[in-house]
Amino acid sequence: EMDIPGYNPVFPVPADKLEELIPLIEDARRPVIYAGGGIISAEASGELLEFAERSQIPVATTLMGIGAMPETHPLSLRWLGMHGAVFANNAVNEADLVIALGARFDDRVTGAVNMFCPESTIVHIDIDASEINKNKKVAYPIRANVKDALQVLNSALAAKGWERRSSGFTRTPEWFGVIDGWKKQYPFSYEDRKGYIAPQAVIEELYRQTADKDPIICTGVGQHQMFAAQFFKFDKPRRLATSGGLGTMGYGLPASMGACLAYPDRLVVNIDGDGSMLMNIQELATIHVERLPVKCIILNNQHLGMVVQWEDLKYDSNRAQTFLADPHDNYDPTHKTEDVIYPNYPLICAGFGVKCERVLRIEELPAAITRMIESPEAYVLDVMVPHDVHVLPMILGGMSYKDVILERIAGDGSAKKASELGKEIPTAL
């Protein structure tokens, strides 16, 4: 057993301040909970679920808070932010009461801070006093361990007779109606192009085959990271290991190794991009030597996909060192000319003693994923996907939720934005 020195702040829970929030909750007509990674750090997922079910308030998490609230729960808004759900961003920004729990109002969530939650009364509960009022001024700043704070709030609601409900919500029915409309009109979606493997379809198929296995999903950083967060639903905390704060490419492979060591009987899948995978590909040697049964899916578009997306958005699709294929070969974006695919991941993996299978066609995908899952050893799938797919929706830095991009930028700067759709998007305000 290890005894590692660390910082363990202990201070009394301000129960009086927390109980002042109960009338706010009672009076709110458009309430939303905005939950961050602090919920997971505090091991407060159970308390968050109870609070949401007692108060009947929908919950949007941050990327680092994914899994804090079961994403298949009726009260879940999935996650908000630059590439988050339209319905999550709309709900948080149009709420009259926002209860922020263990979140930091970072720019990937807020966009233009002055346009974030313009009409909302904001409560911010966080253990770190330096995070409160740092980016966004709030009406009710409360320094507390979020787990302790939620326990106080749950006890106060229980004392008032507010029972837990996992369905059949009776409070704020008009608000739930608006949110349901957003969910139906703007789900996470993608274009299914004939002859190509959509990267989102890969995540959906992985989810279909593994949802009942309670897997641990790790990612690198890039488009694949966002696709994993959008199209894999996480119902428990610490099931998604991703670098969402620093955004460190190459994180996925070593993270999956650590997960395998910590949970040797669990299915661990690293979802990676070809660029991110190359950052730490040497760890395949450790995986082989230590016999770690890491599964890895490379969404291989032979480009730095997220940077390509920004090149499309801002630089008229001019490429600057984002092309990762062999410049001496005739690049085939359909990936039908298999002998020009570079680098050769099956050959590289073979050199490390790790099984690798390349997937070129969508009809090959389900069986390939099944073989990967059922393998008792490390297994890599090199799945060829198109390089011109964008992660959508998208809110550019410094913009508001009303400026969300819903369609792919074609390179000429044209795209349909929410602000251009007018009455097509219902609003609560």
Predicted features along the sequence, with ranges:
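Conformationally flexible catalytic loops at phosphate/diphosphate-handling active centers
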Residues: E1-D27, F188
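Gly-rich Lys/Arg/Thr-decorated short loops/hinges at beta-loop-alpha junctions or inter-strand turns
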Residues: E1-G6, P70-E71, V178-Y190, K236-R239, ...
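Glycine-rich, acidic loop regions that bind phosphate or pyrophosphate groups
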Residues: P9, G65-E174, I369-I373
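Glycine-rich phosphate/diphosphate-binding loops that line cofactor/substrate pockets in enzymes
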Residues: K17-P31, F51, V92-E94, E205-P215, ...
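A short, gly/pro- and small-residue-rich
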Residues: E50-Q56, T110-A129, P393-I409
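Thiamine diphosphate
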Residues: M82, E94, N133-N135, P141-R143, ...
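Active-site diphosphate/adenylate-binding microenvironment
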Residues: F176-P254, A259
